[in-house]
Amino acid sequence: MQVRSAAASDAALLHELAAVTFPLACPPDALPESIQAFIDEHLSEAAFTRYLADPQRELFIAEQDAAPLGYAMLVHAEPTDPDVLAALTSLPSSELSKLYVLPDAHGGGIATSLVERCVSSARARGAASVWLGVNQLNSRANRFYEKSGFERVGIKRFKVGARYEDDFVRARIL
């Protein structure tokens, strides 16, 4: 298994991964049409094309024998959400904005490899911490992030469709 930097030509692949993996991280009672609308707006091929062109973002793809297993996106910019800013104590901080692994690859160390690549990149860019938001009801992800050194430091709002969720803000000091 390898983790590589995503290229501009990976926008369609990243969209395909996101379309499969994002619904798995949503609350069980999230409406399918709200999930799809979020994917269409924030995880489309066009959205990934924009993300890949943004110098403040880095995207990574985990692969095994050239088959994609998951992806991560790191944002090297100060958070604009006041709840996140209030929760963070070590600045500057990069955001682990996206971390998703295909269901068949869960438990194989892929997410850990992606996190460590993101942490290494954030450290190289001078970040004092890495933060993320995770749904409070996503117990699997919360256990993983805790095991990976991300402490719960606050709560922020996350909108899917017309509904707001209260996500945990987690941070890892570098």
Predicted regions mapped to residue ranges:
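Extreme N-terminal starter segment of soluble prokaryotic enzymes
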Residues: 1-3
